[in-house]
Each structure stands twice: as C-alpha cells, then as structure tokens.
C-alpha cells in the first residue's frame, strides 16, 4: 500500500521537532536500563510464586517493546514529521507505540486491584491472587488490547501532505473511524481503568485505617504505592487523552473544521511525548513499595558499574550481585538475623579452619 496525498489542515511540523525527540532520547537512556533491572526483579518475584511479579514483569516487557520503537520516532520528528522507513514499519511501530499506552494502563490497574485485594480481603480472594490467575489475567489483557487497537493495521497509515511530508499514524483532520476508535480508547482504555484504580485506592485507605495490627510505616507504604499508581496514570496519560477526546469530539461535530486541529497541534504532540515518561515512572514503583528497594537498586547499579569499569571483569563476574525485591526484603533480613550468629573466618593457606562467634544481628 502506498502513500495517500490529501489536502488536510495546515499544521506546522517545524514548531515541535525538538521537544518530542529530546524527551524520547531521555526515555531511552533512562528507561532502557531501569526497565531491564525491573524485569529481572519482577522475574525473581515470579520465581517466589508472587502474583504481583507477574503484572510487574508484563509491565516491564510492554515498556521495553515501546522503548525499542522510540529511535524511529526520534528520526521521524527530527525530519519534521516525515516518515522515511516505509509503510510496513510505520504500521508495526505505530501499532506498538500506541497500543503500549493502554497495555501499561491496564497492568497498572491490575496492580492496583491486586493490592486492594491483598489489603482489604487477604483471605476471601486468595485464589485470585495466585500466579496462575495473574498469568491468565495478563493473557486476557494482552489479547484484549492488541485486538482492540488492531484496526490501524488494516488501513493505510501513511499520508503525504501538500508540503511533501509523509505522516505516520497522523492525519489532520482525522478520519471518521479513527474518531470513534479514539472515543473507545478514552472511555474504555483510559477512564474505566483509572476509575477502578480510584475505587481500589479508596478501599485500600478504608482497610488500612481500620487495621489495628498494621504498623504505621507499613500503612504509609501501602498508601504511597496506591497513590503512585494513580499519579502515574494521571500525569503521563491524562493530558494526551484530554486532547484526544477534544479532537475527536470536535471532528465528529465539524469534520472539516481545521481551526482547532491547527491550534492544538503542538500541544497534542507534546502530550503524546509525555506518555513516554510512563516507561521511566514504572520502575520507580519498586522504590515506592519498600524503603530498602532504593538502596538495593543503587547497590546493584554500583556493582554493575564496578564490573564494567574493572580491569578484572572475571573476578567481578564471580561476585554475588543480589537485589532484594520489595516483598522479600523482610524475609531475607529475618534469615540474616538467624544465620548472623555464626560466621566463618577465612583461613590462610595451611591454617586450621576456625569458627568465630559473632553477636546476633540487631
């Protein structure tokens, strides 16, 4: 399928050709290593039969797929919204780019609901908080979002304007079927999950306030996690969906009115770029879940940097590089307290092995 030339709205792609690619480059530099680290930490949680790790692992996979598309979008914006990589790549990378928004929102919603069930109904809904259930829910999320956002794969998504710019996944004004699909995305893909997250947060607050056995620090940690999930969706995705809803509603009312499209063109591109910050915010969830997670991640990164800078990488490779996930930190600290009473003093060559009694860990 070739490019289609159309007499569309007069949008100046030169006004915002620096901000989106600059933000995307930042997301690549920060989001790629942190999501790789988050993926590894989530995998460790799955190994410990923790259902939360399944959702976090899927969230990291979605973010990494999204980050892999960003270099082409950097090139697209630096060329003033001119796609030079052909229609096939436009469809594939555009599909991944836009679908990731709703996959990320869905998994953030899953995490929020899972935390609500864990805090408010730990025994009643225990079966819903198993790894098998989380895998099934994740499969449904992927299948639903991929199917719901697959319509662009069956339409031409390259459009050449009067200035010989080839737009990918963009048309000003939009087409009718795109406007209706955008309404579905706004209400079902964005507002519905966000409403569930707000209800989950409200339920978590009620359960935490009514709990006598939960420590104050633990209550603060639970509230912080639930609030951070809502904040990520609000900050990263709300501006984009406000403009998306406005553009779609105005098009359905006045299909060939280009005035609004031309006024919000730059703001729309900026809001779309802001959605990429989700890939940076998601790994921060680990630090918000547990106070010790920040030091654990920093320690792992420090050891990794030492490994890369070391003259003896093999020695560093043999070193133990561990990272306590938020849900295992307490378990590991208890194990250390039990085993910390005894420690072996490393013997010199030819010496007898001596055992040294150490005081219990505090």
From Swiss-Prot:
TM stretches of this protein: 9-45, 50-80, 86-121, 130-156, 173-210, 215-250, 261-289
Disulfide pattern: 9-258, 90-168
Residue ranges annotated as Extracellular topological domain: 1-8, 81-85, 157-172, 251-260
A GO CC annotation given for this chain: plasma membrane
Activity regulation statement: Activated by a network of residues that connects an extracellular-facing cavity to Glu-145, a conserved charged residue buried in the transmembrane core of the receptor. Protonation likely drives conformational changes in extracellular loop 2 (ECL2), which stabilizes movement of transmembrane 3 (TM3) and a series of rearrangements that connect the extracellular-facing cavity to Glu-145, a residue only conserved in proton-sensing G-protein coupled receptors.
Predominant cellular place of this UniProt entry's protein: membrane
Annotated consequence of substituting residue 51 to A: Induces a shift of the optimal pH for activation
Protein's UniProt keywords contain Transmembrane: yes
Annotated positions for site Proton sensing: 155, 165, 269
Outcome following mutation: residue 4 to Y: No effect on pH-sensing activity
Glycosylation sites: 3, 164
Record localization: Cell membrane
Swiss-Prot/TrEMBL keywords: Cell membrane, Disulfide bond, G-protein coupled receptor, Glycoprotein, Membrane, Receptor, Transducer, Transmembrane, Transmembrane helix
UniProt family annotation: Belongs to the G-protein coupled receptor 1 family.
Task of the protein: Proton-sensing G-protein coupled receptor activated by extracellular pH, which is required to monitor pH changes and generate adaptive reactions. Activated by an optimal pH of 6.8-7.2. Ligand binding causes a conformation change that triggers signaling via guanine nucleotide-binding proteins (G proteins) and modulates the activity of downstream effectors, such as adenylate cyclase. GPR4 is mainly coupled to G(s) G proteins and mediates activation of adenylate cyclase activity. May also couple with G(q) and G(12)/G(13) G proteins.
Name of this chain's protein: G-prodeshotein coupled receptor 4
Gene source species: Homo sapiens
Gene that specifies this protein: GPR4
């Amino acid at each position: 399928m070739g490019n289609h030339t159309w007499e569309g709205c007069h949008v100046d792609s030169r006004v915002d050709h620096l901000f989106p690619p600059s933000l995307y480059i930042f997301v690549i530099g920060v989001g790629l290593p942190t999501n790789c680290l988050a993926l590894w930490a989530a995998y460790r949680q799955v190994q410990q039969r923790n259902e939360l790790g399944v959702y976090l692992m899927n969230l990291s996979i979605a973010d990494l797929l999204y980050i892999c598309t960003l270099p082409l979008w950097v090139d697209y914006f630096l060329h003033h919204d001119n796609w030079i990589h052909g229609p096939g790549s436009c469809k594939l990378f555009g599909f991944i780019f836009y679908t990731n928004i709703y996959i990320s929102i869905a998994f953030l919603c899953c995490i929020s609901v899972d935390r609500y069930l864990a805090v408010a109904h730990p025994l009643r809904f225990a079966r819903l908080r198993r790894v098998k259930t989380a895998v099934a829910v994740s499969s449904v999320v992927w299948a639903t979002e991929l199917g719901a956002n697959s319509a662009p794969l069956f339409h031409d998504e390259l459009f050449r304007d009067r200035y010989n710019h080839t737009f990918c996944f963009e048309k000003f004004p939009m087409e009718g079927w795109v406007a209706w699909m955008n309404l579905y995305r706004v209400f079902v893909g964005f507002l519905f999950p966000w409403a569930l997250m707000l209800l989950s947060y409200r339920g978590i607050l009620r359960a935490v306030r009514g709990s006598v056995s939960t420590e104050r620090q633990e209550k603060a940690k639970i509230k912080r996690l639930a609030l951070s999930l809502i904040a990520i969706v609000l900050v990263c995705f709300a501006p984009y969906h406000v403009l998306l809803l406005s553009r779609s509603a105005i098009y359905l009312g006045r299909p060939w009115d280009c005035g609004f499209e031309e006024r919000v063109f730059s703001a729309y591109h900026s809001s779309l770029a802001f959605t990429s910050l989700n890939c940076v915010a998601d790994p921060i969830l680990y630090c918000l879940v547990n106070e010790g997670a920040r030091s654990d991640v920093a320690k792992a990164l420090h050891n990794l940097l030492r490994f890369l800078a070391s003259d003896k990488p093999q020695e560093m490779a043999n070193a133990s590089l561990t990272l306590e996930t938020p849900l295992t930190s307490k378990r590991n600290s208890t194990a250390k307290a039990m085993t910390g009473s005894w420690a072996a003093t490393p013997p010199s060559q030819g010496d007898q092995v001596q055992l040294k009694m150490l005081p219990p860990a505090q």
